[in-house]
């Protein structure tokens, strides 16, 4: 099986930092690190199964959406693999920022 690669946009990188910092404050370092591992595993699943996320063609630009625990991973597919555009809390109004 051929596995695509994934990469993070700058905004997605910042989202991960923000999620980690908030997680440390709320739940402690160990839990924040476990949650980061969970998100990274989801990124790997997206790379292995790029169509796992539901396509949202009504958003501009169109993105795929994949849930991961309390967060939503927004990504697009291109010739280089999966670009993780944002990682947003599922309870946020993330639709307006779907494209980054």
From Swiss-Prot:
Description of the deletion phenotype: No visible phenotype when deleted singly or as the parDE4 operon.
Pfam families in the cross-refs: ParE_toxin
Keywords: Toxin-antitoxin system
Family per record: Belongs to the RelE toxin family.
PANTHER family: TOXIN PARE1, TOXIN PARE1-RELATED
Summary of the function given for this chain in its UniProt record: Toxic component of a type II toxin-antitoxin (TA) system. Its toxic effect is neutralized by coexpression with cognate antitoxin ParD4 but no other ParD or RelB antitoxin.
Protein name: Toxin ParE4
Gene it is expressed from: parE4
């Amino acid at each position: 099986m051929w596995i695509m690669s994934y990469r993070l946009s700058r905004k997605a990188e910042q989202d991960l930092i923000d999620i980690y910092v908030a997680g440390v404050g709320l739940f402690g370092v160990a839990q924040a690190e476990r949650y980061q591992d969970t998100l990274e595993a989801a990124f790997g699943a997206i790379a292995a199964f790029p169509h796992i996320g539901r396509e949202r063609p009504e958003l501009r630009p169109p993105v795929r959406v994949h849930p991961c625990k309390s967060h939503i991973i927004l990504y697009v597919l291109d010739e280089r693999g999966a670009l993780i555009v944002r990682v947003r809390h599922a309870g946020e109004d993330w639709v307006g920022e779907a494209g980054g």
